[in-house]
Amino acid sequence: MQARDPHANVFFVGLMGAGKTTVGRAVARRLDRTFFDSDHEIEARTGARIPVIFEMEGEAGFRDRETQVITDLTQRENIVLATGGGAVLRPENRDCLKNNGIVVYLRANPHDLWLRTRKDKNRPLLQTEDPKGRLEALYEVRDPLYRECADFVIETGRPSVNGLVNMVLMQLELAGVIAKPLQA
């Protein structure tokens, strides 16, 4: 992997519940960068929660808003961005992420994701009779897309949030994005 701009943006991709927001926020704090979550940004811009947007506009309307937010945010510098789990479904989003920063895929198996998200009613795609099966289906479709745009993959299985943050920082150091991992 070639050395990159030391001020490069860092973008997190992965399925819902993988830890993109939690880990992303901690990485941003350690790098002294501004953190954004694309879903939170959509909610701030519309004044509506994600389930309401899905209900009113459908998934296609939500994805249009998501593409606009990703396009806008990836033009900034020195940011850390946690994307929504489905952001990679659109080729233009994958290209935008790949071309404007370092992409980190936080990978978790569907069973672990189900354990983390099973009580969360703010995830419209999981409001089904078989949310675990839904996560497995989403994983099958999205895993190759996450891998396509990722500069590296971090397995989220057992490590603590701090452990995951340190793994991300180590990869950023190896990629030439930071001089050395910063201490907590």
UniProtKB/Swiss-Prot annotation:
Cross-referenced CDD domains: SK
Pathway: Metabolic intermediate biosynthesis; chorismate biosynthesis; chorismate from D-erythrose 4-phosphate and phosphoenolpyruvate: step 5/7
Compartments where located: Cytoplasm
Protein's UniProt keywords contain Protease: no
Domain of life: Bacteria
Residues binding substrate, per UniProt: D39, R63, G85, R142
Cofactor: Mg(2+)
Organism: Burkholderia lata (strain ATCC 17760 / DSM 23089 / LMG 22485 / NCIMB 9086 / R18194 / 383)
Binding site for ATP: G17, A18, G19, K20, T21, T22, R123
Family affiliation: Belongs to the shikimate kinase family.
Function as written in the Swiss-Prot or TrEMBL entry: Catalyzes the specific phosphorylation of the 3-hydroxyl group of shikimic acid using ATP as a cosubstrate.
A Gene Ontology term for the protein's cellular component: cytosol
Catalytic activity, as annotated: shikimate + ATP = 3-phosphoshikimate + ADP + H(+)
Subunit field text: Monomer.
rRNA processing in keyword set: no
Binding, Mg(2+): T21
Cited InterPro entries: P-loop_NTPase, Shikimate/glucono_kinase, Shikimate_kinase/TSH1, Shikimate_kinase_CS
Keywords tagged on the record: Amino-acid biosynthesis, Aromatic amino acid biosynthesis, ATP-binding, Cytoplasm, Kinase, Magnesium, Metal-binding, Nucleotide-binding, Transferase
Cofactor binding comment, as recorded: Binds 1 Mg(2+) ion per subunit.
Entry's Gene Ontology molecular function annotations: ATP binding; magnesium ion binding; shikimate kinase activity
Biological processes annotated in GO: amino acid biosynthetic process; aromatic amino acid family biosynthetic process; chorismate biosynthetic process
Broadest EC class assigned to this enzyme: transferase
Entry's EC annotation: 2.7.1.71
Name of this protein: Shikimate kinase
Annotated gene: aroK
